[in-house]
Structures are given as C-alpha cells and as structure tokens.
Swiss-Prot record:
Signal peptide: none annotated. NDH-1 is composed of 14 different subunits. Subunits NuoA, H, J, K, L, M, N constitute the membrane sector of the complex. One of its GO terms (molecular function) is NADH dehydrogenase (ubiquinone) activity. This is NADH-quinone oxidoreductase subunit N. It comes from the Bacteria.
Length: 475
C-alpha cells in the first residue's frame, strides 16, 4: 500500500488537529488571527504536497490520485485559503472571531479533497459528509444573527435530505453492481449482456440528485438564496467555491467512469438540469435588490454553464468544465472580497443601492467589482469569456446545438444584471462612503482583478493542465 498517495490529506488532517489544540491551549482570549494564519499555511503546504504527489490507486482501491484529483484539490485548497483570508479582516464585525472558524474551514476542505480522490462509493459519502457537516456549522456560526441560524438550519435539513438521496442511490448501485469500487461498477455495466436494470438507473438518478443539490443546480437550488444571504459573507464565498468544486469532482469522475457506459441514459437528465439552471439563474437574478441573493442566483446559472461540459461527455467537454471552474474561482473570490468590504459605520450593507456612486468614493474598489461583473457576464478578454467559450465549443462539437443556444441566450440575459451593478457604481448619485477596509481585502480584490484581467496569459498552461486532468477520467 502506497501511503504517500494520501500524504496531502494526512498532513492537512494533522495540521487541523494541531491548530485545534493550539487554539485551546492559547492563553489569548481569542487566538483567531494566529489560527487563521496557521490554517492558510497548512493550505499552502498541502498544495505543494498535492503537486508533488504520485499517481496511483491505493488503500484497497478506495483512493485514487491522478491529474484530475490534483487539479480539483488545488482548486479546493485555493477556495479554502482565500475564504480564510477574506475572514481575517472582518471577523470581529461578522461575529465569527473564534479559532474554531478556520479549523472548520480546514476540515471542510479536507472532505472536499477526499471527494476528489474517491474511488469507492464509501469514500465518496465519507468525504461528502465531512465537508458538509463543517459547512452546516459555519452557516450558523454567527449565533447572534437570526438569519444565520435560519440559514444553518435550512441548509442542514435540506442537505441531510440530499445526503439521504445520494446514500440511497449508492445502495441501489451497489445492490445491482455487486461492488462499491468504481472500476468494478464500470466492469459490471460494460460486460452486461442485458439492458441496464431499471433499479440501477434509479440509483444513478438518486445519486445525480444528491450531487446536483451540492451544486445548487435546478431543481435542487431552493436552499441557495436564503443560505447565501443569511450565512456570514466569508462562508458564502467559501460555499460558492470549494464545495461546488468537490461536488463537480465527484460528478465528473462518477459519470465519466463507472457510469460512462450508460451515458445516453443520464446525459438527457444532465442536459435538462443545465438548461434549467442557466435560464432560471439568469431570470431570477434580475429583480434582486440584495447583492448576496443576486450572487446566489448567479451561481445557479454558472453551475448550469459548467454542466454543459459534462453534457458533452467528451474529454473536450470535461476540459471546458475544469477551465470554467478555474475562472469561476477567480471571479467569485474577487466579487465576495468587494461584498465583504461593503460596510458603513461598522455595519454590513448588502443592498445593490448601497454601491451607488462607489466609482466616485472608492474608484479602486469599483473598478475591481466592474472587472468581476464583466467577467461573469462573459465579456472578452476577461477570464469568464474563455471559460464560457470552451464549454460552448464542447457543446457544439457534441451536436448539442439547443443547449449551446440556451447558454448564449442566458448569457445575454445575465449580462443585464451584471451591467446594472456597474451602472449603479459609476453613474448613480453617490451614497455615503464605505468604511476603510483592511489590507487583506485589498490584497485579495487586487490580486483577483489582475488574475481575471490577465487570464489570457496563463490560458495555455491552465488549459493544458485541464486537458491532462480530463484525459485521466477516460483512462
């Protein structure tokens, strides 16, 4: 057994336990800052170990490490590190200044990494629950906020239902395939001389339902707006990133691997989910006046675009999805850095109208937000354009012309509410200026703005890494 396959996960878990003990024994009343810095350091160290980790399958065929797993782990670690950085500046204002907060982010990211390396239905579920349980607590971490408690409870109840659907679907697949290993399931389906049993198809549908819930894709999106609005904003930024990357890692690996031989049966379902997510996300965001709710509906639409690559069912489509998720990370983290900076007299303001005149009172922050909004709309030459271009090309090459057409229409509709935010910032009468923001938020917003604007310079290496990751799914 090659234990080095899981060395990044082992190190991250040990770091999490060490930081937890450090926080308990610290004599400071609130060792939040030191624990946050240690958590970011643990993410960086784990990232280096992920890059250096070898390929292989180990631990009795329940854990796999390949180019795809490494790609998704790096995305998840980046999402966790950026969420921790976003928390540092405003932890006291958001009432989350307790050392357990970064530790929970760390263990949630650990679960996301386990999901990316899952090669067995059991590790799939364990990784999913490790990630989800930490997020349930994080959503309700601001105990004095009524909306935070409501968000945590709502996400817990609906998330438990989704986990039950996933577990029931997994049990059906295990019952019909006779094994929990992905390779064994794939062999059972590929060597079957009869039609695919209806019970097995029900199992696939239930698993698909559980995973699309984690993606906030239609029709399992109902929790997203309320939870995004009620949770602490840095938690919302995290939820919009790492957990979705992990769910996509599971979805792509399971659908391309063990269920690849029954692709015609599930592709039509995924295509419908993608269409509905794009249209609903774009249309429902138009009347929103709260920017966190708008970002929630926007994320529903973005997951629809990312699912287009899976609908294609090709390595080109998977590559498009991975590049899209990379660009989504940059845009999402940057936009939430601006949203966290929206404070007046120490109080959080999340109304779109509160951005009025930001171009006059804080032109740097307004310019960064404009970059992220135009990128989410898919305007060239920003990062979001290249992500959409790749998934659209993959859909067209797979002859999914209707899906591609709906994607274009949804992008045009979505452009309206993104441009509306830019209009409010630069052309409306100025509101009272926002509070001075900490250096960490300026660092993240500027860094993400530069990365989003100059993504073309790294498109080649990112696309090559995504291509290698996609090819690993079809070996």
């Amino acid at each position: 057994m090659n234990w080095t396959l899981a060395l990044p996960e082992i190190v991250l878990a040990l770091c999490g336990l060490a930081i937890l003990v450090f926080g308990v024994v610290q004599k400071k009343e609130q060792p939040f800052l030191s624990c946050s810095m240690l958590t970011i350091g643990a993410f960086v160290l784990t990232g280096f170990l992920v890059v250096m980790s070898p390929d292989g399958v180990g631990y009795n065929h329940i854990f796999v490490n390949d180019d795809f797993a490494r790609f998704m782990k790096i995305l998840s670690l980046a999402g966790g590190a950026f969420a921790t950085m976003l928390t540092v500046g405003y932890a006291r204002n958001m009432k989350v200044e307790r050392f357990e907060f970064p530790v929970l982010l760390l263990f949630s990211t650990l679960g996301a990494m386990m999901m990316a390396s899952s090669e067995n239905l059991m590790t799939l579920f364990i990784g999913l629950e490790l990630s989800s349980l930490a997020i349930y607590i994080l959503c309700a971490f601001a105990r004095d906020e009524v909306r935070g408690g409501e968000a945590g409870l709502k996400y817990f109840v609906l998330g438990s239902l989704a986990s039950g659907l996933l577990l029931y679907g997994s049990s059906l697949v295990y019952g019909y395939a006779g094994t929990m290993e992905y390779g064994g399931i794939q062999m059972a389906l590929s060597t079957s001389s009869t039609a695919v049993p209806m019970g097995l198809m029900f199992g696939i549908v239930f698993m698909l339902a559980g995973l699309t819930f984690k993606l906030s894709a239609v029709p399992f999106h109902m929790w997203t707006p309320d939870v995004y609005q009620g949770a602490p904003t840095s938690v919302t930024a995290y939820m919009a990133g790492a957990p979705k990357f992990a769910a996509f890692a599971l979805l792509l690996r399971v659908m391309a691997g063990p269920f690849g031989h029954v692709a015609p049966q599930w592709q039509i379902l995924v295509e419908g989910v993608s269409m509905l997510s794009m249209l609903f996300g774009s249309l429902a965001a138009i009347p929103q006046t709260d920017i966190k709710r708008l970002m929630a509906y926007s994320s529903i639409g973005h997951m629809g675009y990312a699912l287009m690559g899976l609908c294609a069912g090709t390595a080109e489509g998977m590559r498009g999805t991975l590049v899209y998720l990379t660009t989504y990370l940059l845009m999402n983290v940057g936009a939430f850095a601006v949203i966290i900076a929206m404070r007046r007299k120490g109080r959080e303001v999340t109304g779109i109208a509160d951005l009025a005149g930001l171009g006059k009172t804080d032109p740097g922050l307004a310019t960064a937000m404009a970059i992220f909004m135009f990128s989410m709309a898919g305007a060239p030459p920003l990062a979001g354009f290249f992500g959409k271009m790749m998934v659209f090309y993959a859909a067209i090459n797979a002859h999914l012309f209707g899906l591609a057409a709906i994607g274009v229409v949804s992008s045009v509709i979505g452009g309206y509410y993104y441009v509306r935010i830019v209009k409010v910032m630069f052309f409306d009468d100025a509101a009272a200026p926002l509070d001075r923001r900490p250096l960490s938020l300026s660092f993240v917003s500027v860094g993400m703005g530069i990365a989003t604007t100059g993504f073309l310079l790294v498109l080649g290496p990112v696309s090559s890494a995504a291509q290698a990751a996609a090819q690993a799914l079809f070996r």
